[in-house]
Amino acid sequence: MSVSSNASSASNKDSVDSPSSTTNTDSSELTHILNRRQEIMESQEAGIEVRRTYKVVNVYTDFPEFSRNQIKDYQKTFNTYDTARDGFLDLQELKFMMEKLGAPQTHLGLKQMIAEVDEDNDGKISFREFLLIFRKAQAGELDSDSGLNQLARLTEVDVEQVGVSGAKNFFEAKIEQQLRTNKFHDEIRAEQEERRREEEERAQRRQQFQQRAAIFQ
C-alpha cells in the first residue's frame, strides 16, 4: 500500500472548501484512512475477525418506504464518505461529511448524531443505520435544527455540483417552507380553538338563560 497513491486519490476529490482548509482537511482525512486501514490489517494478521461491510439484511425490504433508486442514491452517498471502506461511518468520517455538506458539527454534536441511530451501540453508523436517518426525517421525527436533519436535507442536493452555498440555500429554503407550513397550521389551529371557545360560551349562555327562565316558571 502506497501512502503517496492514497494521497493522490484523496486530492483528486472535488472540493468545495477554501484551498487552505481543504489541504488541512484532506491531510487529516488521509491520516485517518491510513490509520483505519492499518488497524484492519493488524486485526486480520492477529486472527481477529473484522466486521465487514454488510450485515445479513435486505434494506430493500427493511425500508419499503424508499424506492430502489433512492436506496442506491443513499448507498452512493454513504460510500462517498466511508473512506476506510469498512462499511461504517465513524466519528471522523461523519465529521468530514458534515464539513463537506457545509454544516460542521461539534464533537459532542457528532456523538449525538451517531447515538440517535446507533442500534448496536458500536459508536459507528452502518448503512442500515444511515437509512434510519432518512426514515426519521421523512416521518418528521428529527428536530429541525439537529445535525441528522441537516444531513438528511443537505444530501437531497448534490453538493459537488451546486457547491456549499447552493446546498445551504436549498436547505434554508426548505426550512423557510416548513416554517411557513407550520405557521399556516398554527393559524388553523388557533382559528379552530377560537371557534371552540365561542361555541362553549354560546352553550354556557343558553344554559344560564334556561336556568334563569326556569326560576320564573
Swiss-Prot record:
**Which stretches make up the EF-hand domain?**
69-104, 105-140
Note down the stretches annotated as region Disordered: 1-29, 191-217
Arranged from A to Z, the UniProt key words for this protein are: Calcium, Metal-binding, Repeat
Is the keyword Metal-binding in the record? yes
Q: Where does Ca(2+) 2 bind?
A: 118, 120, 122, 124, 129
Which InterPro entries does the entry mention?
AIF-1_EF_pair, EF-hand-dom_pair, EF_Hand_1_Ca_BS, EF_hand_dom, EFHD1/2
Q: What would be one Gene Ontology cellular-component term for the protein?
A: mitochondrial inner membrane
Q: Give the residues the record marks as binding Ca(2+) 1.
A: 82, 86, 93
Record-level GO BP terms: mesoderm development
- Comp. bias (Basic and acidic residues): 191-204
The Low complexity compositionally biased stretches are 1-28, 206-217
Q: Which SUPFAM superfamilies match?
A: EF-hand
Q: What are the protein's GO molecular function terms?
A: calcium ion binding; calcium ion sensor activity
Q: What is this protein called?
A: EF-hand domain-containing protein D2 homolog
Whose protein is this, by species? Drosophila melanogaster
Taxonomy-wise, where does this protein's organism fall, top ranks first? Answer: Eukaryota, Metazoa, Ecdysozoa, Arthropoda, Hexapoda
